[in-house]
Design a protein with these regions (language model features):
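Jelly-roll (double-stranded beta-helix
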Residues: 1-5, 48, 135-136, 162, ...
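Short beta-strand His + acidic residue motifs that chelate non-heme Fe in jelly-roll/DSBH
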Residues: 67-69, 85, 90-98
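Hydrophobic, aromatic-enriched interface-forming segments
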Residues: 168-192
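Short acidic-glycine-tyrosine-enriched beta hairpin
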Residues: 72-87
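A short, Lys/Arg-enriched amphipathic alpha-helix from helix-turn-helix/homeodomain DNA-binding modules
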Residues: 143-146, 190-198
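All-alpha amphipathic helical-bundle segments outside canonical DNA-binding/catalytic cores
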Residues: 144, 157-174
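Generic protein-terminus/edge-of-domain signal
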Residues: 1-76
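A hydrophobic/aromatic-rich effector-binding and dimerization subdomain
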Residues: 2-30, 34-36, 92-155, 177, ...
Length: 198
């Protein structure tokens, strides 16, 4: 049955447990989880024109230096910079003179992003997405995890197995986990009392 989980009870027959979550999972799988997670490697040698972002995007700088302008704010780029852009971010890349930016770009729909941030393992009571994108500079283990996740996403683009979408979702959870680990917790909270921008 679609809404039940069955477990074996040491040879005494199956135990059937009702699970309301399975219905939510089925809805997510059939209606929210995208079939077209897209990941590709970009090599940028010259300033790019502005682009209007429509998706949820994770970007990881692999090589080169320069800057990224998002909604009029400049962010320095160097290897192992991880960025998360949301819809309505307007951005462009400007490599340093004589440098080439190498960036892995992985995109998904916003419904999947909402499902990701609702993950109870994030242990965050509030999660607000501000107009300034989260940008973190990684070293050590977190840099290794981010690069491994992007390598996995690039690899799945070539394989496209039956499990590719679920595997890509797990890699993206790794990237979101890194952002929530590195960004100040206040970034994701909304202080309704002060009205001050932090």
């Amino acid at each position: 049955m679609a809404d039940k989980n069955t477990f074996e009870n040491e040879g005494k027959g199956p135990i059937t447990i009702n699970s309301n979550f399975s219905g939510a999972h089925d809805y997510f799988t059939n209606n929210v989880l995208p079939d077209d997670i897209r990941t590709h490697l970009r090599r940028i040698k010259a300033p790019t024109p502005y682009a209007n972002n429509r998706d949820q995007v994770f970007m990881l700088v692999r090589a080169g230096t320069g800057k990224m302008v998002v909604n009029g704010i400049e962010y320095r780029l160097k290897p192992n910079t991880l960025i998360n852009l949301g819809p309505f971010h307007r951005y462009r890349f400007i490599p340093d003179v004589g440098k080439m930016l190498e960036i892995v770009d992985s995109r998904m729909n916003s419904g999947t992003y909402v499902y990701m941030i609702a993950n109870p393992y994030l242990k965050m009571e509030q999660f607000y997405v501000t107009s300034e994108p989260p940008v973190v500079y990684l070293t050590g283990l977190l840099a290794d995890i981010a690069n491994d996740s992007m390598n996995g996403l690039l690899g799945e683009m070539n394989v496209r197995s039956d499990d590719s979408t679920s595997i890509c979702f797990c890699y993206m959870m790794d990237l979101l986990g890194i952002l929530t680990e590195k960004m100040p917790k206040a970034y994701f909270r909304h202080d309704s009392g002060s009205g001050e921008k932090k």
